[in-house]
Amino acid sequence: MVLLAVGELSASLSLLEECWHYLFLGIIQGLTEFFPISSTAHLKVIPLLLSWDDPGVAVTASLQLGSIIALIAYFWNDLAFLMRGISKASFQNSWNNQNTKLASAIVLGTLPIVFAGMLIKLFWQGYETSPIRSIPAIAVVSIVMALLLLIAENVGRRTRNFENLSFWDGQIIGFSQVLALIPGVSRSGITITTALMIGWERKSAARFSFLLGIPAITLAGLVELKQAFGSFELVDVFPLLLGITSSAISSWIAIDCLMKFLQTQSMMIFITYRFLFGTLLLFWYYLAF
């Protein structure tokens, strides 16, 4: 009986610890997916700093579901309006309107990252363990992205919005999204940076980035989940659901905060954070290892 009691206590502590890990990682996923600071980088670095095991592809893909749910829920009215506009255009055979332009931009902007992702899966078998995903690489990329965002803040005219959306906007921003396959770049970071560089105002740049992210994040999450299917045991289900829930809630908060923040503020807080994050990460890595 004593041995059984000890075993049950140990199991409960293990489950409690696992719940805490998933809860915390879900919050990190949600906040860093939509703030332009790279969720992949933080989900790789933070567990390492805390001496936790690497969460792995299966866990990060699952946590990404929470971000997808929050993103679709937050922009549900935009998506419904977009679909109604497309439906109306199809009945009237009139495709030269803002809804169809936006839908085309999202579809065309998603194609480059889909093809690039497929090529990596097919031909780069060592991608998950390649030097491009190492801590020093993530640190350097974070610093480079800080500099690019700083340039975008200073050279962008910030005069364009959805009223001025063109065919090339979707192409240019979509091709830049491919760089998000490099850990540390940040999908929202590179797309917002590119939009600012070609003259978009901050809030519109963020909104288009998030709308463009719906198919990209959804497809990436589903592909990784399919590959990882069957790797979870029954005991993992509750902690995993807890992580997905915390990811969804923190994602919603991050999206809402960023949209409101960019109405009046610049990107300097994120530029500063990314520069400090990359610099401190380099120092820590070379001192620790």
Curated annotation (Swiss-Prot):
Record has Transmembrane as a keyword? yes
Q: How does it sit in the membrane?
A: Multi-pass membrane protein
So which domain of life are we looking at?
A: Bacteria
Is this entry keyworded Protein biosynthesis?
Answer: no
Cellular component (GO) terms are: plasma membrane
What GO biological process, any one, is recorded here?
A: peptidoglycan biosynthetic process
First-tier enzyme category under EC:
hydrolase
The extra comment attached to this record reads: Bacitracin is thought to be involved in the inhibition of peptidoglycan synthesis by sequestering undecaprenyl diphosphate, thereby reducing the pool of lipid carrier available.
Q: Which HAMAP family match?
A: Undec_diphosphatase
- Family label: Belongs to the UppP family.
User: How is this protein named in the record?
Assistant: Undecaprenyl-diphosphatase
- From what organism does this protein derive? Prochlorococcus marinus (strain SARG / CCMP1375 / SS120)
> Organism classification, top ranks?
Bacteria, Bacillati, Cyanobacteriota, Cyanophyceae, Synechococcales
